[in-house]
């Protein structure tokens, strides 16, 4: 029997996906199989629980949604790989800090496959290349189970990041995989990063699914 279901969902609207995550987490029990949801979102700013309104400088035509994850404001859009981690931390005897570290290290290993030297920072969660942020993290834990997750910039229009202070840091530089790896695609990065996450989180029986 699978101990992890990996869903490739394509492009999904943010609100419906967030509601689905909350519902999944509220209704799961100790026998529920963990899931990873891999997708892209249409253009949207999301403001985390620690977010301040002044960090949203000029949203313009992009909607802003107040959400229940940790962290501050970030941007999602086509060409960015989003992976939501619906993990029973109690079952895995995993603390939140250990989960964050496992995610960051999986991203670092994934990028290294393409010759990109990346690293986390102790003062600002996420993964960075030469000081520029390439991946953001924001999690919520409820009843010992995680939801929300990571966003890796792959091959996207980066302009909307200039409309905010990403993660609450004024002037933070952002970058993406395609800056360093020609031809980078969300599909390829999804395949590589899921493999590293599975290894880092210790799942052994993985079931791949297309769609819900």
Swiss-Prot record:
Q: Which HAMAP family match?
A: LipB
Record CDD domains: LipB
Site Lowers pKa of active site Cys: list residues: 133
Which organism is this protein's natural source?
A: Marinobacter nauticus (strain ATCC 700491 / DSM 11845 / VT8)
Something else the entry says is: In the reaction, the free carboxyl group of octanoic acid is attached via an amide linkage to the epsilon-amino group of a specific lysine residue of lipoyl domains of lipoate-dependent enzymes.
Q: Which UniProt keywords apply?
A: Acyltransferase, Cytoplasm, Transferase
Q: What does this protein do?
A: Catalyzes the transfer of endogenously produced octanoic acid from octanoyl-acyl-carrier-protein onto the lipoyl domains of lipoate-dependent enzymes. Lipoyl-ACP can also act as a substrate although octanoyl-ACP is likely to be the physiological substrate.
Q: Does the keyword rRNA processing apply?
A: no
Family of this protein: Belongs to the LipB family.
Query: Biological process GO annotation list?
Result: protein modification process
Which pathway does the UniProt entry assign to this protein?
A: Protein modification; protein lipoylation via endogenous pathway; protein N(6)-(lipoyl)lysine from octanoyl-[acyl-carrier-protein]: step 1/2
The protein depicted here goes by the name Octanoyltransferase
**Catalytic activity, EC:** 2.3.1.181
């Amino acid at each position: 029997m699978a101990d992890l279901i990996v869903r490739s969902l394509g492009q999904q609207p943010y609100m419906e996906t967030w509601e689905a995550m909350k519902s999944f987490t509220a209704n799961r029990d100790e026998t529920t199989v963990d899931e990873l949801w891999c997708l892209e979102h249409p253009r949207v700013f999301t403001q985390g629980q620690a977010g301040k309104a002044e960090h949203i400088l000029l949203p313009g035509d992009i909607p802003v949604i107040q959400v229940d994850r940790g962290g501050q404001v970030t941007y999602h859009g086509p060409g960015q790989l989003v992976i939501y981690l619906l993990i029973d931390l109690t079952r895995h005897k995993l603390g939140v800090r250990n989960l964050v570290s496992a995610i960051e290290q999986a991203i670092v290993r994934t990028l290294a496959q393409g010759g990109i030297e990346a690293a986390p920072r102790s003062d600002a969660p996420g993964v960075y290349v030469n000081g520029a942020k390439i991946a953001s993290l924001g999690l919520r834990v409820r009843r010992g189970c995680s939801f929300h997750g990571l966003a890796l910039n792959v091959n996207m229009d980066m302009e909307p990041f200039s409309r905010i202070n990403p993660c609450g840091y004024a002037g933070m530089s952002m970058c993406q995989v395609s800056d360093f790896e020609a031809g980078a695609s969300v599909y390829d990065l999804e395949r590589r990063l899921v493999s590293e996450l599975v290894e880092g989180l210790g799942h052994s029986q993985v079931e791949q699914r297309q769609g819900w």
